Curated annotation (Swiss-Prot):
A GO molecular-function descriptor: SNARE binding
Function statement: Required for vesicular transport between the endoplasmic reticulum and the Golgi apparatus.
UniProt gene name: Napb
Compartment(s) of residence: Membrane
Main location: membrane
Name the UniProt record assigns to this protein: Beta-soluble NSF attachment protein
Organism lineage string: Eukaryota, Metazoa, Chordata, Craniata, Vertebrata
């Protein structure tokens, strides 16, 4: 069957489902088998949604799954309702990001009501990703990553940390340095005692120190001493050595020495966009009024 044929069949199923819903509302039907009609309508809406999906009509698929979700709720089938809202969200993601968020939020409300916080956390991440990539609303992405981390805490600390690190990275980009520092220090402290994760701790302390550095050079020095004391392995890391060189260059207001230290580090460990942005912000304070080539190379 071609896409047009699938769409036609889906439209027929939607019409049949609507008839079943209307029939369930009549007085006698309500007394005798009203729920059966609703169950049949649920099944038809779901079949229609899947036909629309095969025809790649994502909005129609999302709408059909939504109708099924509402009827499942009418039947007190919370789990089925949440599942249908998630299916609706996944379909809408391809056509209408805001509607996808609305459906996923509806699913989250049901899961939290059922005490299924880990599943709710997963869907908060999906919403955060839609805000990141489709709607480009970083403040809202941060809020959903924070909520996800909150739900994961205690049950899945690794997943909570991943969400918190997203929050920290965005907070620093938005110049909310204190918030970023607190998260990087917290995650660093959590991971440094874990044999499998402790290698990552140096990265988190490095990022926290850079955030301190942007705000105040003395803060960065004190933070560096604290991190070395907390996590002795940090002292021998390339990140710690770079920080010391940068602090020295900053103290001397030596832009060339600063750039040279960054280039040397970058030749072994490629700098990502976040690190490049933070290092440039620090470099501008060396250049005084922010003049210069605005480059690290």
């Amino acid at each position: 069957m071609d896409n047009a044929g699938k769409e036609r069949e889906a439209v027929q199923l939607m019409a049949e489902a609507e008839k079943r819903v209307k029939a369930s509302h009549s007085f006698l039907r309500g007394l005798f088998g009203g729920n059966t009609r609703i169950e049949e309508a649920c099944e038809m809406y779901t079949r229609a949604a899947n036909m629309f999906k095969m025809a790649k009509n994502w909005s129609a698929a999302g709408n059909a799954f939504c109708q099924a979700a509402k009827l499942h709720m009418q039947l007190q089938s919370k789990h089925d309702s949440a599942t249908s809202f998630v299916d609706a969200g996944n379909a809408y993601k391809k056509a209408d990001p805001q509607e996808a968020i609305n459906c996923l939020n509806a699913a989250i409300d049901i899961y939290t009501d059922m005490g299924r916080f880990t599943i709710a956390a997963k869907h908060h991440i999906t919403i955060a990703e839609i805000y990141e990539t489709e709607l480009v609303d970083i403040e809202k992405a941060i809020a959903h990553y924070e909520q996800s981390a909150d739900y994961y805490k205690g049950e899945e600390s690794n997943s909570a940390n991943k969400c918190l690190l997203k929050v920290a990275a965005y907070a620093a980009q938005l110049e909310q340095y204190q918030k970023a520092i607190e998260i990087y220090e917290q995650v660093g402290a959590n991971t440094m005692d874990n044999p499998l994760l402790k290698y990552s701790a140096k990265d988190y302390f490095f990022k926290a120190a850079l955030c301190h550095f942007i705000v105040d050079e003395l803060n960065a020095k004190l933070a560096l001493e604290k991190y070395e004391e907390m996590f002795p392995a940090f002292t021998d890391s390339r990140e710690c050595k770079l920080l010391k060189k940068l602090l020295e260059a900053h103290e001397e207001q030596n832009s060339e020495a600063y750039t040279e230290a960054v280039k040397e580090f970058d030749s072994i460990s490629r700098l990502d966009q976040w690190l490049t942005t933070m290092l440039l912000r620090i470099k501008k304070s060396i250049q005084g009024d922010g003049e210069g080539d605005g480059d690290l190379k």
